[in-house]
């Protein structure tokens, strides 16, 4: 995340996310604090490829040199006179789109929620851009020169008090890391030493606040708390990084124990996406559930010391352990639980890699084989995590730090059910890692912390989980419920089943006006994407195999094409996107990948659920539209 300070032009933000699976509201685990009240506003703007041609033709035609220089010139022209730095996570995606990310600065310090992303197409010209740069009045002098800010320890105590964090800091000391960053040493209660960073943040009222960004990893919540640097009892916003051989397993796409039997699979990895297999990192070969992509273990006490936790070990690499849904207690089948979790997460890794979530895009791997990105960040998979029940979550720090998935025991059935065995739970949680790493760039894991953008994070998780579980005989009349097995309920844990029937599922874009909770908003987003899925399947057919087949870089069926376009759209859209901006990014992704051959199928799907041409975002009064472009009528 180190970059050059550049004089120039403008947009918005950079953090990590813990996202929980099915909770009705985002509460700070066990402490009664409503984190939704601290969410950042979704304030980014996005210019699609069509917008660029109409409104910024000179910039749209920029080309020549390398893509980084072109992107930098775009920001300079769009935001003249502003200062910014390039974030060190630019890359060329598998679809040929180059993604470059910038952070606005003021007096040599970051404006932590002011980001700019530029997407360069395969032809070297500007495809689209998004930004949230601050354009209000600037402070006269640098606060470091005036020393016009509080001691960081006061801000640390302010964050702990406001969020009721169980951190003991009576003997804490400050270790200075650089001019603007400190570490709080000698504390207890957090999973690692808390950190502080002096930075600006753009407020909703159009002004700029100087803040201490206090980072505290509490396990179920990994928080970036923006504490006012003058009034340390005031917390402006909070970002939560947590979103919330042979293997005997329920083989993909079996979603849960009610729909299939366990079987023994041999060497299930794909050597193109996991060249070291699942049980090696290229340096060490393991005989347990550990490898380059993930490390899985029991975590009965809910603690952070995963390396020393129990995991099954098989010298002959036969991870074959007994399990049946009626077994109890859960600890009696922990080997099977860890093995299933390890299998499912690695399957997700390999599929997402094929679709474009590679090393340079910020995926989760220890050894990146010189392919770009930052390594040393496999996913920590905690089975039967003792820190909670009836839930699951995923912590997504920036690229280079391990992701962490916690899956819990569910007590809504007798005997209790282990969510390691519900593939949809694992896919949903892993997809939080995907969307948080792609949106805003690998170094910025906090771009989905707004209400609508956070809702899309939940919706993407449901969408990938639902698309992956489709059966061979399914058609557009097939309905799917999310989380029915762990919930022991045919209704699952969402408002409605996912369906193309508006009577079965009446949700439309304007339904978001009555919801103020990310899982409800996510259900709306997934309902819209479900229409996209079936429009593309009806046109291109459905590949029922576990992996896509590509022709000239394009999946040759509708299911995997839908997943590919949605994934590419995540990387194209701005930080803290809205439904409208994410829609445009998916359409731009298709323009890049297929030259827009699916434009009308996409528009008709969006319009059916009220996200047509005239749809407009307002957090309290969204405007719906069923209109499509003239050429699609």
Swiss-Prot record:
The keyword Nuclease does not apply. Residues 1-20 form the signal peptide. Glycans are attached at residues 285, 592, 621. GO terms for cellular component: extracellular region. Zn(2+) binds at residues 428, 432. InterPro entries: FTP_domain, Fungal_virulence_M36, Peptidase_M36, Peptidase_M4/M1_CTD_sf. Its EC number is 3.4.24.-. Its cofactor is Zn(2+). It is found in: Secreted. Residues 21-244 form a propeptide. Binds 1 zinc ion per subunit. One of its GO terms (biological process) is proteolysis. It comes from the Eukaryota. Its main location: secreted. The active site is at 429. Keywords: Glycoprotein, Hydrolase, Metal-binding, Metalloprotease, Protease, Secreted, Signal, Virulence, Zinc, Zymogen. One of its GO terms (molecular function) is metalloendopeptidase activity. Belongs to the peptidase M36 family. Secreted metalloproteinase probably acting as a virulence factor. This is Probable extracellular metalloproteinase 5. It comes from Arthroderma benhamiae (strain ATCC MYA-4681 / CBS 112371). The lineage of its organism: Eukaryota, Fungi, Dikarya, Ascomycota, Pezizomycotina. The gene is MEP5.
């Amino acid at each position: 995340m180190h970059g050059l300070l550049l004089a120039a032009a403008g947009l918005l933000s950079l953090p990590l996310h813990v996202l929980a699976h099915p909770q009705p509201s985002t509460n700070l685990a066990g402490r009664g604090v409503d984190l939704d009240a601290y969410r950042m506003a979704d304030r980014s703007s996005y210019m699609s490829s069509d917008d660029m041609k109409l409104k910024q033709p000179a910039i749209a035609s920029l080309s020549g040199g390398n893509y980084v220089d072109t992107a930098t010139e775009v920001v300079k022209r769009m935001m003249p006179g502003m200062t910014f730095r390039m974030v060190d996570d630019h890359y060329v995606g598998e679809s040929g789109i180059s993604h470059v990310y910038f952070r606005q600065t003021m007096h040599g310090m970051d404006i932590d929620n002011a980001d700019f992303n530029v997407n360069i197409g395969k032809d070297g010209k500007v495809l689209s851009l998004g930004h949230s740069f601050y354009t209000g009045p600037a402070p006269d002098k640098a606060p470091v020169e005036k020393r016009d800010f509080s001691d960081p320890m006061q801000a640390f105590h302010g964050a702990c008090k406001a969020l009721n964090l169980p951190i003991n800091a009576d003997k804490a000391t400050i270790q200075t890391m650089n001019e603007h960053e400190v570490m709080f040493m000698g504390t207890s209660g957090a999973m690692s030493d808390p950190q502080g960073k002096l930075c600006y943040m753009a407020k909703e009222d159009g002004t700029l606040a100087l803040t201490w960004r206090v980072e505290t990893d509490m396990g179920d919540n990994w928080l970036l708390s923006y504490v006012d640097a003058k009034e340390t009892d005031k917390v402006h916003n909070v970002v939560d990084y947590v979103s919330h051989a042979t293997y005997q397993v329920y083989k993909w796409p079996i979603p849960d124990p009610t729909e299939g039997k366990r079987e023994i699979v041999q060497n299930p990895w794909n050597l193109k996406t996991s060249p070291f297999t699942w049980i090696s990192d290229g340096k060490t070969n393991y005989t347990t559930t550990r490898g380059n992509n993930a490390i899985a273990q029991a975590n009965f006490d809910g603690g952070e010391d995963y390396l020393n936790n129990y995991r099954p070990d098989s010298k002959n690499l036969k991870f074959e352990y007994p399990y049946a849904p009626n077994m109890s207690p859960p600890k009696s089948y922990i080997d099977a639980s860890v093995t299933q979790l390890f299998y499912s997460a690695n399957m997700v890794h390999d599929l997402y890699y094929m679709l474009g979530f590679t090393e340079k895009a910020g995926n989760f791997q220890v050894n990146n084989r010189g392919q770009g990105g930052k390594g040393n960040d496999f996913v920590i998979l905690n089975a039967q995590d003792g820190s909670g029940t009836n839930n699951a979550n995923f912590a997504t720090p920036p690229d280079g730090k391990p992701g962490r998935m916690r899956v819990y025991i569910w007590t809504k059935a007798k005997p209790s059910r282990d969510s390691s065995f519900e593939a949809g739970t694992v896919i949903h949680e892993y997809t939080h890692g995907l969307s948080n790493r792609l949106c805003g760039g690998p170094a910025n894991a906090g771009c989905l912390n707004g209400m609508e953008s956070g809702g899309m994070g939940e919706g993407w998780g449901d969408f990938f989980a639902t698309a992956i579980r489709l059966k061979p005989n399914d058609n557009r009349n097939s309905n799917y419920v999310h989380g029915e097995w762990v919930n022991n309920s045919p209704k699952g844990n969402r408002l409605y089943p996912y369906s193309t029937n508006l009577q079965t599922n009446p949700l439309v874009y304007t339904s978001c006006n009555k919801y103020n909770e990310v899982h409800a908003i996510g259900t709306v987003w997934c309902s819209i994407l479900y229409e996209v899925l079936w429009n593309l399947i009806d046109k291109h057919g459905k590949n029922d195999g576990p992996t896509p087949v590509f022709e000239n870089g394009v999946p040759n069926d509708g299911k995997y094409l839908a997943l590919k376009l949605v994934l590419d759209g995540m990387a194209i859209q701005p930080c803290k996107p809205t439904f409208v901006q994410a829609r445009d990014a998916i359409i731009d992704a298709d323009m890049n990948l297929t030259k827009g051959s699916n434009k009308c199928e996409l528009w008709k799907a969006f319009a059916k659920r009220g996200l047509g041409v005239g749809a407009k975002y307002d957090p309290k009064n969204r405007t719906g539209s069923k209109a499509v472009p003239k050429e699609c009528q």
